[in-house]
C-alpha cells in the first residue's frame, strides 16, 4: 500500500491518499476474493480511514470484516502483521480480551518480533492500573475523598442542569443518575456527574483515561477519545457526561482477573467541565500506530 505510506505535510492530501488506498485495495480484492493478503491490506486501509478521515463505526466494522476474510487464507493467517493490526483495532474498540489474544497470536507467529509483546504487556499494565485505581478510588485518602464528594455542586452541570439540554432546535431530556444505575450500552436521556480522582496512564496516550467518583462514592473509569494534545482534566474537576456509554469488562487473562466498568466518550465536546461545556478546540483526531514488520 505505497500510496498510504507516502509522507505528506498537508492533512487534506493525506486524506486523499488514504481514500485512494481504500479504493485500490477494494479493486485488488475484487480481482481475487480468496487472496488473504489483499483482504489484509484492505483491512489496514479501512483502519487508517477510520482514524484519519472519520471515526465512523461502520468503517471499523468493514475493517474487522476484511481481517476476518483474510484469516480464511492459510498464507495470510500466518502473517503476524494481520494479528498485530487487528489487535490495535480491538484495543480501540475496548474489546480488551480479544486484543490481548490477537497480540499473543502475533507473538506466536514471530517470536523474534518484540513489538507485539511490548504492546501486549503495555495493555496488560494499563488494565491492571484501571482495575487497581477503581478499587482504591484513585488512591485518594478518605478525608480528601469526602471533601471532594461534598464539593459536588449541581451548578457545575452547566447547560445540562435542569433536566434537559437544548442545542439549536433540538432538546434532549437528561435525568441525573448515580453511576451504579447505569446499564451496559448507551444510557439514553441519562446524565452522570462526578469528581476526577486520578488519571490513568496509557503508553499510547489514547484514550485519555481518568476515574470519577459520584455522590455515593462509586468510582468508575472514563475513557475519552479525540482529545487534543495538551488537553485533559485535573484531579478535583467536576465532570458531567450526558447519555454515557457503559462497558463492563469481566475476563481473565494470563493470571489476571479483570472486573470493572468504564464510560466511553467518543468526543470531548459533549463533556461539561466545572460548569462549562468543552469547545471544538478540545477535539483532535486519533493518530494510528499500525505496523508492517520489515523482513
Task: Tell where the protein language model's regions lie, with residue ranges.
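Short coil/turn linking the two alpha-helices of tandem helical-hairpin repeats
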Residues: 3-13, 48-57, 94, 114, ...
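Short coil turns that delineate tetratricopeptide repeat
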Residues: 33, 75-77, 111
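OB-fold (S1/OB) nucleic-acid-binding surfaces
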Residues: 187, 195-226
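Short nucleic-acid-contacting surface segments enriched for D/E, G, S/T with interspersed K/R
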Residues: 226-242
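OB-fold/S1-family single-stranded nucleic acid-binding modules
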Residues: 242-294
Amino acid at each position: 500500500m505505497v500510496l498510504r505510506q507516502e509522507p505528506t505535510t498537508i492533512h487534506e492530501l493525506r486524506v486523499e491518499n488514504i481514500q485512494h488506498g481504500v479504493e485500490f485495495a477494494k479493486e485488488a480484492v475484487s480481482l481475487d476474493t480468496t487472496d488473504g493478503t489483499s483482504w489484509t491490506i484492505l483491512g489496514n486501509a479501512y483502519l487508517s480511514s477510520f482514524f484519519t478521515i472519520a471515526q465512523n463505526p461502520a468503517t471499523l466494522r468493514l475493517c474487522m470484516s476484511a481481517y476476518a476474510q483474510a484469516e480464511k487464507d492459510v498464507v495470510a493467517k500466518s502473517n503476524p502483521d494481520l494479528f498485530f493490526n487487528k489487535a490495535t483495532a480491538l484495543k480501540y474498540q475496548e474489546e480488551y480480551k480479544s486484543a490481548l489474544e490477537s497480540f499473543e497470536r502475533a507473538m506466536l507467529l514471530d517470536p523474534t518480533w518484540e513489538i507485539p509483546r511490548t504492546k501486549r504487556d503495555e495493555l496488560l499494565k494499563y488494565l491492571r492500573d484501571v482495575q487497581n485505581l477503581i478499587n482504591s478510588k484513585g488512591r485518594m485518602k478518605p478525608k480528601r475523598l469526602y471533601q471532594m464528594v461534598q464539593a459536588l455542586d449541581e451548578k457545575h452541570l452547566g447547560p445540562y442542569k435542569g433536566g434537559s439540554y437544548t442545542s439549536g432546535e433540538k432538546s434532549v431530556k437528561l435525568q441525573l443518575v448515580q453511576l451504579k444505575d447505569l446499564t451496559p450500552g448507551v444510557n439514553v436521556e441519562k446524565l452522570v456527574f462526578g469528581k476526577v480522582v486520578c488519571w490513568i496512564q496509557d503508553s499510547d496516550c489514547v484514550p485519555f483515561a481518568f476515574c470519577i467518583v459520584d455522590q455515593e462514592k462509586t468510582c468508575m473509569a472514563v475513557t475519552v477519545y479525540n482529545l487534543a494534545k495538551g488537553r485533559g482534566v485535573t484531579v478535583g474537576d467536576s465532570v458531567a457526561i450526558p447519555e454515557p456509554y457503559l462497558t463492563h469488562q469481566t475476563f481473565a487473562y494470563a493470571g489476571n482477573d479483570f472486573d470493572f466498568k468504564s464510560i466511553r466518550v467518543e468526543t470531548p465536546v459533549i463533556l461539561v467541565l466545572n460548569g462549562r461545556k468543552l469547545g471544538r478546540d478540545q477535539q483532535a483526531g486519533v493518530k494510528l500506530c499500525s505496523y508492517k514488520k520489515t523482513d
